[in-house]
UniProtKB/Swiss-Prot annotation:
The keyword Transport applies. It is found in: Cell membrane. GO terms for cellular component: plasma membrane. InterPro entries: CstA (IPR051605), CstA_N (IPR003706). It holds the Pfam family CstA. It comes from Mycobacterium tuberculosis (strain CDC 1551 / Oshkosh). This is Peptide transporter CstA. Disulfide bonds: none annotated.
Length: 758
């Protein structure tokens, strides 16, 4: 029988649902639901909108009385419901227009290693775990310095209108191009000049991003036997789950999920016991350098092993811990009704001289929150691993848009863990050592001088707060992660266990942070491998083979290049705490948002090329906002005369001290530290310029191509010809009644995918 073509599409309508066939001789490959919105649904969505509007009113305008954290959770939840049901649906209908009779890259190129059609629940778990890393946890905690109101608005509204849109549409254009990487799509759609800039610049950006994420993991796990044991156990558990689904019980996702959750909980609980044994403390109390090498080895393995064996099941497994803990925190907010201690808008929002980070609300609030609302890193996953696992185009909305929406909710909860803390303790945790000298007495004096509302803090209060979580000190525990753990412990002990379990929850939170962030390191490494392969393949000759992921020598070689790049920077940061990656951390937010600018540029151009100029505002408005934020931030970082903001000004000040033979200057306490600052500010400033040049080249090329397209003279659309699908799978995480009925008819396990017979 001749292979069917997409033009053979047949729809058989039955009631409010239609069965879609790629060919009359094949079983259905999709169910299209066309049920009109009922009165009950209308009442529900109107009620959600009204409740959400009321919650936002309380959050935004109540100034003379304390605001309960529950209002922010309600406002966020209602906004997400309306956004997903209506705005995401608008994008699906007007821009994406999914065709489930078209085969996805996973179905067309199924090789059992990189391209593997995977159950949408596992894909959602992998995708969410891969995109949600340090950004949505740490960024909102640091941004609390500016107040809870601007942060909460940007996290929620920014995600619905920008972050979720970017993720959904990058996934869409990558799926339509056989899962190509972001850099390769820039070259294909915008031309060679922009393509070269992107294929060179994006790998540099992603290297820094992965190294920063890995450093947070190392810091969390160093000398933490509980965390090391529990996270190490997720690897054999994931391999077991992968083999179980692949060989023992194919399609039984719910079954293996229950087994995996049970084993994961056992690993978490037993980790506390192991940490208190002599052998456990000896085996799993690892130095930062040892953890670096183990993390590098794991990243390489996750990049080259079949995606079904380690990466996908481990990310899916981690999602249960991530979502479960965030849900527990949300329940804690609703049960404990904590009062927000942070001001709606702090004085640091305007002055720009806050102790946590320097800079005014615009643009640095948006840079600091980073992945919580809009994440360029997500675009790498949406054009990396996820499109190579997707079963059907109809699943893109729940995975792309819904995945980022879930990440945004994580950021909301992270914001609340910091906002409910006594603000004197918040700034005690986050004030630099330069101001506190790591002393409770000095910290109390410094924090009390910030002009915060509420009762002044005492050294005894600070010491008691540290003792309550089993720590020697909480003074100047900068970086955001310790504050998040302290806030999580503060919230969870009110709901489960009381004061006696506060220390347990604190150390659980440290382990949770490492588990949460590690999934972005492994998926990011694999996505970067695809990008390196695409970039080198453009040189032609024998390197052309690198663009074929099935060529294993190329996959191994590119993976080695990627882990060597971020691993070397990670080792530098660990062995030289004052230099290397620590000084690159301020670049993380800007680099991430500049990457989003590249992704949104490509999306906007593709929408125009497809003849949907009328809807180009959907990605176009977020693009303009992102460029305004990131280019302003980059300008200030490069040219500001304030040494706390401008890299080159700080470089000049420390270089002058170096030339004068100073042995101490600013935050540097000796000559070696002065040399470190001089070197690292030079690297920071140089990379800032490089990143801006790359983005400007891509945006200018995008504008030129878009204008030529409108005039009928643009570069042709680089979309691959569709291939007919022979695979059926439900579109949503929960199958509809019609989908379940068809599944039973086809004899598949509940909710699983089914391949049509040849």
């Amino acid at each position: 029988m001749a292979a069917p073509t997409p033009s053979n599409r047949i729809e058989e309508r039955s009631g409010h649902a239609s069965c879609v066939r790629a060919d009359a001789d094949l079983p259905p490959v999709a169910i299209l639901g066309r049920s009109p919105i009922t009165l009950r649904h209308k009442i529900f969505f109107v009620a959600v909108a009204v409740i959400g509007a009321l919650a936002w009113t309380v959050v935004a305008f109540f100034r003379n009385e304390p605001v309960n954290a529950v209002w922010i959770v309600v406002a966020a939840g209602c906004t997400y419901i309306i956004g997903f049901r209506f705005y995401a649906r608008l994008i699906e209908m007007k821009v994406v227009r999914p065709r489930d009779d078209h085969a996805t890259p996973a179905e067309i190129l199924d090789d059992g290693t990189d391209y593997v059609p995977t159950d949408r629940r596992v894909v959602f778990g992998h995708h969410f775990a891969a995109i949600a890393g340090a950004g949505p946890l740490v960024g909102p905690v640091l941004a609390t310095q500016m107040g809870y109101l601007p942060s909460s608005i940007w996290i929620v509204v920014g995600a619905v209108l920008a972050g979720c849109v970017q993720d959904y549409l990058v996934l869409w254009i990558s799926v339509r191009r056989r899962g190509r990487s972001l850099g390769q799509m820039v070259r294909d759609e915008l031309g060679a000049t922009a393509g070269v800039a992107a294929l060179v610049g994006i790998p540099v950006i992603i290297t820094i991003v992965i190294a920063v994420l890995a450093l947070v993991v190392v810091r969390a796990l160093a000398k933490s036997p509980w965390g090391v044991f529990s996270i190490a156990m997720t690897i054999p558990i994931a391999i077991f789950m992968g083999c179980y689904l692949r060989f023992l019980r194919p399609g039984r996702v719910s079954e293996v999920s229950l087994i995996g959750i049970g084993l994961l909980l056992l690993a978490v609980v037993s980790g506390d016991w192991v940490a208190h044994t002599s052998w456990g403390a000896a085996w799993f109390s690892l130095s930062p350098v040892t953890l670096c090498w183990l993390l590098i080895s794991y990243g390489f393995a996750a990049s080259v092993l079949p995606v079904w064996l380690l990466l996908a099941p481990r990310d899916y497994l981690s999602t249960f811990m991530k979502v479960g803990t965030i849900a527990l925190l949300a329940i804690g907010v609703c049960a404990a009704h904590p009062i927000i201690e942070a001001p709606a808008v702090s004085k640091f929002a305007g002055s720009g001289n806050g102790p946590v980070f320097a800079g005014s609300l615009f643009p640095f609030l948006f840079i600091t929150i980073a992945c919580g609302a809009l994440s360029g890193f997500d675009a790498l996953i949406c054009s990396g691993t996820t499109p190579k696992m997707l079963e059907k185009e109809g699943q893109m909305r729940v995975i792309g848009y819904g995945g980022m929406m879930t990440e945004s909710f994580v950021a909301v909860i992270a914001l609340l863990t910091a906002a409910i803390l006594d603000q004197h303790l918040y700034f005690t945790l986050n004030a630099p050592s330069l101001h506190t000298h790591d002393s409770a007495a000095t910290a109390a004096k410094y924090v009390n001088g910030l002009g915060l509302t509420g009762s002044p803090v005492t050294p005894d209060h600070i010491s008691q707060a540290a003792a309550s979580v089993g720590e020697q000190t909480i003074v100047s525990r900068t970086g955001g992660a310790p504050t998040l753990a302290f806030g999580m412990a503060e919230m969870l002990h009110r709901v489960v266990g009381g004061v006696g379990l506060k220390a347990f929850w604190y150390h659980f939170a440290i382990m949770f942070e490492a588990l949460f962030i590690l999934t972005t390191v492994d998926a990011g490494t694999r996505a970067a491998r695809f990008m390196i392969s695409d970039a080198l393949g453009n040189f032609g000759g024998v390197l052309r083979k690198l663009q074929n992921p099935s060529w294993r020598p190329g996959a191994w070689a590119c993976s080695l290049v990627v882990v060597a790049a971020w691993g070397s920077i990670l080792l530098l940061g660990v062995t030289d705490p004052l230099g290397g990656i620590n000084t690159l951390f301020p670049l993380f937010g800007i680099a991430n948002q500049l990457l989003a600018g590249i992704a949104l540029t490509v999306i906007t151009v593709v929408v125009i090329k497809k003849g949907r100029l009328k809807w180009a505002w959907i990605p176009g408005i977020p693009l303009l906002w992102d460029l305004a934020v990131t280019l302003t931030a980059s300008w200030q970082k490069i040219f500001s005369a304030d040494p706390s903001v401008g890299y080159w000004t700080q470089h000049a000040h420390y270089a002058a001290a170096q030339h004068a033979g100073e042995t101490a200057f600013g935050s540097a306490t000796n000559a070696d530290e002065i040399n470190d600052v001089v070197r690292n500010t030079f690297v920071q400033g140089t990379l800032s310029i490089v990143f801006v040049v790359v983005v400007v080249l891509v945006v200018v090329a995008g504008v030129i191509v878009a204008l030529k397209t409108i005039r009928g003279r643009g570069i042709p659309l680089a979309e691959d010809d569709p291939a007919p699908s022979t695979l059926f799978a439900p579109a949503g995480l929960i199958p509809t009644a019609a989908e379940r009925k068809l599944q039973r008819r086809l004899g598949a396990p509940a909710s699983a995918s089914v391949a049509a017979p040849d």
